[in-house]
Amino acid sequence: MSVIKMTDLDLAGKRVFIRADLNVPVKDGKVTSDARIIASLPTIKHCLEAGAKVMVTSHLGRPTEGEYAEEFSLQPVVNYLNDALDCEVKLAKDYLDGLELNAGELVVLENVRFNKGEKKNEEELSKKYAALCDVFVMDAFGTAHRAQASTHGVGMHAPVACAGPLLANELEALGKAMDKPARPMVAIVGGSKVSTKLTVLESLSKIADQLVVGGGIANTFIAAAGHNVGKSLYEADLVDTAKKLMDECAIPVATDVACAKAFDENAEAEIKHVSEVQDDDMIFDLGPESTAALAEILKNAKTILWNGPVGVFEFKNFEAGTKGISEAIAASEGFSVAGGGDTLAAIDKFGIKADVSYISTGGGAFLEFVEGKVLPAVEMLEARAK
């Protein structure tokens, strides 16, 4: 993947426009989770220290496009940056007709979604963004799968378009896991429905040496192996698809499961062999035998790609499968990449953050990359690198 990297450029005196992902939760005018801002700080600091004239922007929430709404303003982000950096940070509300900036100065450009034409990637708006800068830095992997004016169009018209450190690291890590993985390569796909992850499963079945399925997805594969899944969440119309995938790739099917009679936090977990599941049972997790078998597979893996928990880990009685998988990934000496909201929640819950080689910042973008789709922002950066 050939893109220009921001860190390879001389930015002294240059007007630098950074499209970051500062879409953080805000309550009562205060940022309540600063993970995305913290992730963007090294990029901003690098530009400031290089003596650039720095502009950074993002979307925040889902305002009506083209209309200012205070609840979606980036002002709380500006307040946060003022505390985090050794320079005064200002918010620019009207910036499309130009800005005056000094070297080493930082301005946050108000929410891009307040600008009409942002989501539709309109050329007129893209050119206005591009006219503000000498260098456009795309550093928001989380929105790289959307062709919008601030993520794609601006890069087509800016004098130089490059990948920021966050985006470059993301592409490198995902490329390492997907393009030429060290083998054996094990992929874990969890979630409730095969239908929502079908393209992910099909893509990974061609790359992985072992494809581990979990959650409601696993129930469809258990049914495909000829077992009763009782009242469990599964998709009868995709049983044949599951069989086809099992013919094409090594997909270990659970031998034992944790069941209950109702979807209830306090329901007792009954461990059963898959052949013993009753018509009124609901499968909510892997059993200890299955978890141990998967842990053994992960122990020997050289590359692990993880998307989705393998059970209802939010319930104490049904967390053992996901906990076991998490601990096996943490203990593995292989290269591991994890992504997706529920996966990140599991990583936090079981305290293995430091033991995962790379944690992806993108939800939808991560999935589209894993599906083998070309991300519009990445395609633009590749085109501009030629």
From Swiss-Prot:
It catalyses: (2R)-3-phosphoglycerate + ATP = (2R)-3-phospho-glyceroyl phosphate + ADP. The keyword Nucleotide-binding applies. GO terms for molecular function: ADP binding; ATP binding; phosphoglycerate kinase activity. Its EC number is 2.7.2.3. ATP binds at K197, E314, G340, G341, D342, T343. One of its GO terms (biological process) is glycolytic process. Keywords: ATP-binding, Cytoplasm, Glycolysis, Kinase, Nucleotide-binding, Transferase. It comes from the Bacteria. It is found in: Cytoplasm. Pathway: Carbohydrate degradation; glycolysis; pyruvate from D-glyceraldehyde 3-phosphate: step 2/5. Belongs to the phosphoglycerate kinase family. Monomer. This is Phosphoglycerate kinase.
